[in-house]
Amino acid sequence: MTRLCEGRVAIVTGAGRGLGREHALMLAANGARVVVNDLGANVDGTGADESFAARTAADIRSAGGEAVVNGDDASSWAGAKNMIDQAVQTWGRVDVVVNNAGILRDRMLVNMTEEEWDSVIQVHLKGTFAPSHHAAAHWRVVNKKSGEPVKGRIINTTSTSGLYGNVGQTNYGAAKAGIAAFTIIAARELKRIGVTVNAISPSAQTRMTEGLRALNDEQRAARDPKWVSPVVTYLASEAAQDITGRVIQAGVGRIAVCEGWRRGAEAPQVADPIEAGRLLREMLPKVRRNSGMDGMELD
């Protein structure tokens, strides 16, 4: 079997359970050495239990792979740097960062508290920015010393809630939409040193989605996290050097490349608000409607 990530060093945040665990296991099975990061928090971000990360690392080692445990908070500036430093100190390099850690604090906008907003934005958005920043800073130094592309990889995790919008998730959706935009911009910034940046929008049944809908056995099998990890593993490999700035949906029977916002119908600018309204009314029936959670037109 071809081992796509032979000799590469990957950091996976939130790798104790769910999607992150599957990513870590598949990366290791494909030859990567893995820093298994997980606080072991509850779905709402409270608590901590490093045993979940330890179990993933133990499973990697028992299968013949290499892994170390990291219990840092990925959304902490110092914690994110510790992850990068641990990879470099353990194996002399870091090649891949998979930003996967996340929490949920769902609430309708009118009922959402400041803490519920802040905690979700912190974990998802800063938890993507901080590891990416420290990895990019490391790669820039490596690039300057070698003069060669570093072939680094950042793989972020967005969501259909951020891409299409889901009621009751203004905090989560805003964070995930921010991650999609972050991905596109970071890809443009880091291309010159040989780093690719992509995002996965997974459709999978994990503890974070467990209570959202009732599923039969067939539906549950289609939502197994294992269907997402092959895309992550390929993007982590050197073979994916030419793929960057993309948002890719994976799971529930499909792999799909998402198409982002683009300008539709347009008209010349006007000074009169009534005329502006008339032009808007004229254009709106001509443009594509917003997508629903299934990626199809909704409103």
Feature locations, PLM:
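Canonical Rossmann dinucleotide-binding motif of NAD(H)/NADP(H)-dependent dehydrogenases/reductases
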Residues: 2-36
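C-terminal helical subdomain
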Residues: 199, 218-299
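The beta1-alpha1 cofactor-binding region of Rossmann-like NAD(H)/NADP(H)-dependent oxidoreductases
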Residues: 50, 54, 71-82, 114
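Residue(s) in the substrate-gating loop at a strand-loop-helix junction
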Residues: 159
